[in-house]
Amino acid sequence: MVKRSDKVGEQIHKIISELLIKGLKDPRIGFLTITGVKMTPDLRQATVYFTVHGSDEDKKNSEAGLNSAKGYIRKEIGQALKMRFVPEVLFKYDTSLDYGQHIESILKEIGATDDGEQS
């Protein structure tokens, strides 16, 4: 059984992704991807996870651009979803991809060490 919060999160993910393609013109927002949306059970808060392809400076600038567009994004969500309460939107950088790359590099190091020992 799918929870309502999951369905609403998927819809918000779709709306924000479309806004990034069509609606947001902030030059600080770089090439970013919305990786997920987590809703609170009462549907009052949506935490939007994103990744940025670029440097740490690009990450900071993109987060600042997203935070400055919160009001516009929330208004668009409200118009699209027709909910009694429009959830507050919080943006968080998704560190899971960075962590995955870190683990992958460690595994490659271990593999290179094992290959050296076997020779």
Curated annotation (Swiss-Prot):
Main location: cytoplasm
Subcellular location: Cytoplasm
Keywords of this entry: Cytoplasm, Ribosome biogenesis
Pfam families: RBFA
Subunit structure: Monomer. Binds 30S ribosomal subunits, but not 50S ribosomal subunits or 70S ribosomes.
Family listed: Belongs to the RbfA family.
GO cellular component: cytosol
PROSITE patterns hit by this protein: RBFA (PS01319)
Functional description taken from the UniProt entry: One of several proteins that assist in the late maturation steps of the functional core of the 30S ribosomal subunit. Associates with free 30S ribosomal subunits (but not with 30S subunits that are part of 70S ribosomes or polysomes). Required for efficient processing of 16S rRNA. May interact with the 5'-terminal helix region of 16S rRNA.
Taxonomic lineage from the root: Bacteria, Pseudomonadati, Thermodesulfobacteriota, Desulfuromonadia, Geobacterales
Keyword check for Heme: no
Biological source species: Citrifermentans bemidjiense (strain ATCC BAA-1014 / DSM 16622 / JCM 12645 / Bem) (Geobacter bemidjiensis)
Protein name per its UniProtKB record: Ribosome-binding factor A
Disulfide bonds: none
Keyword rRNA-binding: no
SUPFAM superfamilies recorded: Ribosome-binding factor A, RbfA
A single MF term (Gene Ontology): ribosomal small subunit binding
This protein's encoding gene: rbfA
GO biological process, one term: maturation of SSU-rRNA
HAMAP family: RbfA
Cross-referenced InterPro entries: KH_dom-like_a/b, RbfA, RbfA_dom_sf, Ribosome-bd_factorA_CS
